[in-house]
Design a protein with these regions (language model features):
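An acidic/histidine-cluster motif and surrounding catalytic segment
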Residues: 1-92, 96-118
Length: 118
């Protein structure tokens, strides 16, 4: 499966931390020859433009924050793009570094996660 030019990074250029991380990790994608399309996230103050998700409660314990809802809408907009265009895409966050060539052996959702908490 080839998705070399269909990688979308969700970023918030209005947020100093998000901009910092995306600027830091983009060279790692360039190193492996990937072009990353920058996708400007849904902002909490623009949530009123979106009303098609029902969030309920987070783990049944609390309401989701406006930032969490905006994150879900950002991903959902890209999933809709994927379905409407019938294209395979990769969706990454602003702080995802590419450390090796991507290998998507199956169609569908592939999750690559690495959480390091030091």
């Amino acid at each position: 499966m080839i998705i070399d030019d269909e990688i979308y990074m969700i970023q918030n250029r209005n947020d100093e931390v998000s901009a910092y991380y995306s600027d830091q990790v983009i060279p790692s994608w360039d190193k492996f020859g990937y072009y990353v399309n920058m996708f400007d996230c849904v902002y909490p103050d623009t949530l009123h433009e979106y009303d098609y998700l029902d969030f309920g409660q987070y783990w049944g314990l609390r309401d989701m924050s406006e930032g969490e809802k905006a994150g879900w809408y950002s991903h959902t907009l890209l999933w809709i793009k994927c379905a409407m265009e019938n294209k395979d895409i990769a969706i990454i966050e602003h702080d995802v570094e590419c450390v090796a060539p991507l290998d998507f052996t199956e169609r569908g959702l592939n999750f690559f996660c690495c959480y390091e908490n030091n």
